Amino acid sequence: MTTTKSLVRLAHSSDEAEVLAHIRIMHAESGWRELDIDRCRIFLARAFDRKGGILGVIGAPGHIRAMIYVLITNAWYTSDHHLEELFCWVHPDHRNSDYSKLLIEFAKDCSDRISVEMGSKCPLIMGILTGKRMAAKVRLYRRFFGIPVGAYFAHNVCWPQAEPSEEDFWRLPSMAKWLRRHSTGNERKMAS
């Protein structure tokens, strides 16, 4: 059996051109501000130089199929670190794969490893900021993380290829059943 660790590798500076090509595709699908390639290069360098960025990719050099970027950062009110996902993306030709699941597992593994190294928990914060296929993405993240801990709302944003969603993400029947089976009374109160 192939493991997550063997499929997801850390990107290297030699992957930059290919990663940038994928970023252009990703931005065309879901970017909501103008793409600044020089700014992208700054964040890629943080990952390539191991200075607070982690860029995991699936695929050999020249054949990258999926990628995830997590940033070691902190909230404005603390010096305690956490991992923040900047993107988790699978090339359109490979969307019927399990790559998104493998990337999420990779990010969780990074959080676990950094927690051990730091001697305290390094939380992983992942979310969905998109106008396309939101319902499916929310369901995927719920399977890995459980109950959401927040939500984003936007004003004056034009999403490319936006798809309306009528689904109420907070009241999914399957999640209600899961909650009844697996959560404590306090967790159920917080979710309602």
Give short role names for the model-derived ranges.
Residues M1-D38:
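Short amphipathic alpha-helix that is part of the acyltransferase structural core
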Residues M1-S14, W159-S192:
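Conserved N-terminal entry element of GNAT/NAT acetyltransferase domains
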Residues A45-G56:
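A short helix-loop-beta-strand connector motif used in the catalytic cores of GNAT acetyltransferases and
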Residues V57, H63-T73:
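Conserved beta-strand in the GNAT
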Residues N74-E85, P148:
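A conserved beta-turn-beta hairpin within the catalytic core of GNAT-like acetyltransferases
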Residues L86-D98:
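A short, internal acetyl-CoA/4′-phosphopantetheine-binding micro-motif in the GNAT/acyltransferase core
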Residues L102-C122:
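Conserved acyl-CoA
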Residues A107, S120-K137, N156-V157:
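Conserved beta-strand-loop-alpha-helix junction that forms the acyl-donor binding cleft
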